[in-house]
Amino acid sequence: MADPNNPITEPKAIIQSSTSSSVTIVPVPTCGDSLSDSATCENPCPLDTITTTTTTVCFAAPSSTASGNDINTLMATDTDISRRKKNPVYRGIRCRSGKWVSEIREPKKTTRVWLGTYPTPEMAAAAYDVAALALKGGDTLLNFPDSLGSYPIPLSSSAAHIRCAAAAAAATRGAAGAAVKVGQKKEDKVYDTAESSTMGFVDEEELLNMPGLLADMAKGMMVAPPWMGSPPSDDSPENSDGESLWSY
């Protein structure tokens, strides 16, 4: 039994920690065997040292209990963003109150040139092309590069002249679009008329049995004509023998 007046004191564990690692000292109470009730270890064994490394986590792992709706929402958001990036958009235009506004920023300036408001995006895009050619030159990117030779040229680089030429190009683009729509409507109308006339056609030859009638007439023409006797010397009724009609 241990002496209460002289208790055995064991070395306490010393723990040093830092943000990257921690050192833990584990005491060994005896030199192999356990201490007796009346003796103390005068030369205790060296203390064992165990070094452990602490890792700091700087991100949160995804929760395994995340609902399927949250995952679907994230996937839909990514899809919408990629779809918006892939959709073709004309340069220099934006939609406002159901109409399309066209404007361009002057090179090396913070000011913008207002080019007008148009009912269709194609008209606004054509207006931007004219202004871009006037301010940036022929190497600039255009909405309709095929129409480069047909665009009007502003008299000068002033905002008023550029706006006037842009409006003319937009009007031409709008008229061309309207002509295409009218042509399509006419083609559809002609097609509908032809289809209706085809549906109302009546084959009269088939209705009157014309092929059979013609065949009967051909057969009749191949029949030999009836035999006729010698005519009487006198056409008077007295000299007639009563057999002036055909006899078969």
UniProtKB/Swiss-Prot annotation:
One of its GO terms (molecular function) is DNA binding. Its main location: nucleus. Residues 225-248 are annotated as: Disordered. One of its GO terms (biological process) is ethylene-activated signaling pathway. Pfam families: AP2 (PF00847). It is found in: Nucleus. Residues 89-145 bind DNA. It comes from the Eukaryota. CDD domains: AP2 (cd00018). One of its GO terms (cellular component) is nucleus. Keywords: Activator, DNA-binding, Ethylene signaling pathway, Nucleus, Transcription, Transcription regulation. Probably acts as a transcriptional activator. Binds to the GCC-box pathogenesis-related promoter element. May be involved in the regulation of gene expression by stress factors and by components of stress signal transduction pathways. Belongs to the AP2/ERF transcription factor family. ERF subfamily. This is Ethylene-responsive transcription factor ERF026. It comes from Arabidopsis thaliana (Mouse-ear cress).
